[in-house]
Amino acid sequence: MLIRPNKVQKVGNLFMDTVHEEEIRLLNQLYDTLMKKDVEKADQLMDELLVDLEDHFTTEEELMREFEFFAYPMHKAEHDTMRKRFKEVYDKWKKEKNPEEVVRFLKEEFVPWLKSHVARWDSTTAQQLGD
């Protein structure tokens, strides 16, 4: 297991918390698959994660615009940074299919980013959105 669900802060918005829980489930499934070196299944999960991240970020951004969230530009900028970084990892995966590189990215970059992002930006956003 890459990350326990209770290691990512709940933000107090049911929708956002559910999205984060589902993303953690997918991340753990991908991590376990990569550790088993099941390249075919990992390839499917990388595709799924790419779509999941875009849906997650886009939906949050739409909510922020709808509620005129004051920090929308900064929050979106963090999404854009991770969109770009994950796409780089994804594209490299599609060429090389190297499980170790994706595992390193997940452990050293994505999980720390997710914890920080949720605690800093999503929790603030959730306060404005309410439940």
Swiss-Prot record:
CDD domains: Hemerythrin. InterPro entries: Bacteriohemerythrin-like, Haemerythrin_Fe_BS, Hemerythrin, Hemerythrin-like, Hemerythrin-like_sf, Hemerythrin_metal-bd. PROSITE patterns: HEMERYTHRINS. GO terms for molecular function: iron ion binding; oxygen carrier activity. Keywords: Iron, Metal-binding, Oxygen transport, Transport. Fe cation 1 binds at H20, E23, H56, E60, D122. The keyword Metal-binding applies. Fe cation 2 binds at E60, H75, H79, H117, D122. Disulfide bonds: none annotated. NCBIfam families: hemeryth_dom (TIGR02481). Oxygen-binding protein. May be involved in a storage mechanism or for delivery to oxygen-requiring enzymes. The oxygen-binding site contains two iron atoms. HAMAP family: Hemerythrin. Belongs to the hemerythrin family. Monomer. This is Bacteriohemerythrin.
